Amino acid sequence: MLDGSLLARWLAAAFGLTLLLAALRPSAAYFGLTGSEPLTILPLTLETEAAAQAHYKACDRLKLERKQRRMCRRDPGVAETLVEAVSMSALECQYQFRFERWNCTLEGRYRASLLKRGFKETAFLYAISSAGLTHALAKACSAGRMERCTCDEAPDLENREAWQWGGCGDNLKYSSKFVKEFLGRRSSKDLRARVDFHNNLVGVKVIKAGVETTCKCHGVSGSCTVRTCWRQLAPFHEVGKHLKHKYETSLKVGSTTNEATGEAGAISPPRGRASGSGGGDPLPRTPELVHLDDSPSFCLAGRFSPGTAGRRCHREKNCESICCGRGHNTQSRVVTRPCQCQVRWCCYVECRQCTQREEVYTCKG
């Protein structure tokens, strides 16, 4: 589990985190963090092979559902983008929940149990997975790593000029269409599936809402005789923040859940919320996360998490909450870190090694 206060520190440490995608029931099409197979350590860059159809083998190694595998094989760049998307989603999930009792534990048995239930945490996993794929695919298009898509083709922007001047727009139109088809949708009679698909779409919509128009002026002496504009996605860290807020305000739609199967029964619309289309559909029209079941406390080890015993916490920030009232242990240790760094000509950084004493807080069992 990743336990750091700075995103950059553990982004580098978790470089190798990726996926195996699940082959579920024929009518299902789940992806990444919401698959039933365990996440597996693989390189972010798939090994190169001399064969012309090497990407076929890459798609097969991901163990996709039949339709997903067919879509993967259409373009040599898809397989690597899928791997990148899941890694990005997992890292962002763990970063957003680093101060919470549930810190996005992705070990196989905990995640498998969680996905059988319609918790808020489950809703977040669906949203962050679809958002990660949408973001990664749009970026792959604009970076030229895909054969079936290039830069954004927004009719209101001068993409020819944007491309000429190096301002290639992220192709959200292609990526969102691909993701909706890739994730698919089971029968509308399957209520749990409709909730999952709704949360998938929330992830896509948050990506769309974060698109910004970036412009650059060109002309003599800094004049703006020509202005080139292109569309650009928000950093994925911002997407994660928005989805975390939606997690915190997730709407519960009533359910009866079979403990053995995790299948949801009848659900009723949340009070005061407009129903969606489809005659009595309880899902909101607005892009809000929805869940079926109340979440456990995640305080003690169980089916859904390893609990919080031994978890590091910050005394002034979250020890009381994370430790669930059990208190925390304090350990003093001496650490050595680079300090007083200076750039020397040419071309290296010279640092002193400074020692300092720090206190580490961990939850009692």
From Swiss-Prot:
Disruption outcome: Mutant mice die during the first 12 hours after birth. Heart, lung, liver, intestinal tract, kidney and brain appear grossly normal, but the mice display skeletal abnormalities, with slightly shortened long bones in their limbs. The region of bone mineralization is reduced in scapula, humerus, ileum and femur. Besides, hyoid bone and atlas are hypoplastic. In the scull, the supraoccipital bone shows reduced mineralization, with increased distance between the frontal bones. The basioccipital bone displays an abnormal shape and is smaller than in wild-type.
GO CC, one annotated term: extracellular region
GO molecular function per UniProt: signaling receptor binding
TM annotation in the entry: none
First and last residue of the signal peptide: 1-29
Glycosylated residues in this chain: N103
Record note on modification: Palmitoleoylation is required for efficient binding to frizzled receptors. Depalmitoleoylation leads to Wnt signaling pathway inhibition.
Origin: domain of life: Eukaryota
InterPro entries (alphabetical): Wnt, Wnt9a, Wnt_C, Wnt_CS
Any GO BP annotation: embryonic forelimb morphogenesis
Lipid sites, type O-palmitoleoyl serine: S221
SMART domains xref list: WNT1 (SM00097)
Family per record: Belongs to the Wnt family.
Quaternary data: Forms a soluble 1:1 complex with AFM; this prevents oligomerization and is required for prolonged biological activity. The complex with AFM may represent the physiological form in body fluids.
Protein name: Protein Wnt-9a
Source species: Mus musculus
